[in-house]
Amino acid sequence: MTPIQNAQQIFNRQHKNLPEITVYAPGRVNIIGEHTDYNDGFVMPCAINFGTAVSGTKRDDHIWNVYAADLDETDEFSLNVEIPKSEHKWANYVRGVVKFIQERYPDFQQGANLVISGNVPLSSGLSSSAALEVAVGKFCQQLGDLPLSHTDIALNGQKAENQFVGANCGNMDQLISALGQENHLLMIDCRSLETTPTPVPQDVAVIIVNSNVPHDLVTGEYNTRRQQCEEAAKFFGVKALRDVSVEQFQKREAELTALSPLAAKRARHVVTENQRVLDAVEALKNNDLTCLGKLMEASHDSMRDDFEITVPQIDYLVELAQLVIGKSGGARMTGGGFGGCIVALAPHDKVDSVRKIIADNYEKTTGLKETFYVCTASQGVRVI
């Protein structure tokens, strides 16, 4: 059963009527451009065919009653008083989104009954949180007939995660969940918010392999990386590392390394990764999968050696995938790091071989069982 069907059926069962509003927002996978979004840089994700559905109906008061079907938990809060934090982590994503929409539209106090259901694997680096934020934002827009664009909804979700939940994420996850296009990757300029759709080559599959090493961005390491990047930007006298070219970095690399070796390593990753995203757009335009594969490999090496966010299990998955894919595509870690998933682009006729080499070796070596997904690039948030 899909999240949409599940949310609608459970709502019907709980409330004895059909929901007036159902919205659906997808998770995402980032093909290249990791930890560049909060440095005002470039990213190239696609929305995927896993996501979060929200079904609901107006109430005649100011109360939101929210049921998380997959967790069997309920949260309730009022819109006519200051919205406090919840003891349920998932509920804070919902509350944060509503709180900041209210900040923008103080008259938005419409109560609702909601059911949420999703199939984005939690803590996998595929943005279950952004899908939830964007779905709830779109639900609010429909509920209150608010003049919010999809970009507004995305940035509101990011604000909720930064300022209410407490994770210093960039804006990529929410933007792709809101703006994704079917069968396209979206190159996003995280400063101007301009987007450039790039078709996924027809003969290429988007493969995601979950290492099932759990990770949790809220616990420190992610925020530390962000601080180190800000330290490096300050050294270069710029607003963000986006403003430093590879040549400019190389000229002052030794000087920065002497001051702060870690900040230098983090900056080297971000500066070179931004260039890799721009090069990847050209490679895809030219249908040059060998070049794209080299860029993905360089991205992974940089995350491992300079940004230091991979773990041995992830490195091993990438190594296995690369053995099979060769020069016909690429593989790298995707997401915030410290576990989560790898992404691979490979011809459809290599999917089974990639699946087999991982199934034959990963669990035997690491003691963990992978989860293997073949995804399609999908549309962003929509009303059902």
Curated annotation (Swiss-Prot):
Main location: cytoplasm
Residues the UniProt record annotates as site (Transition state stabilizer): 28
Top class in the EC scheme: transferase
Protein location: Cytoplasm
Biological-process GO terms, alphabetical: galactose metabolic process
The keyword 4Fe-4S is assigned to this record: no
GO cellular component: cytosol
UniProt keyword annotations, A-Z: ATP-binding, Carbohydrate metabolism, Cytoplasm, Galactose metabolism, Kinase, Magnesium, Metal-binding, Nucleotide-binding, Transferase
EC number per UniProt: 2.7.1.6
Protein's pathway: Carbohydrate metabolism; galactose metabolism
Family membership noted in the UniProt record: Belongs to the GHMP kinase family. GalK subfamily.
Protein name per Swiss-Prot or TrEMBL: Galactokinase
Lineage: Bacteria, Pseudomonadati, Pseudomonadota, Gammaproteobacteria, Pasteurellales
Gene (UniProt): galK
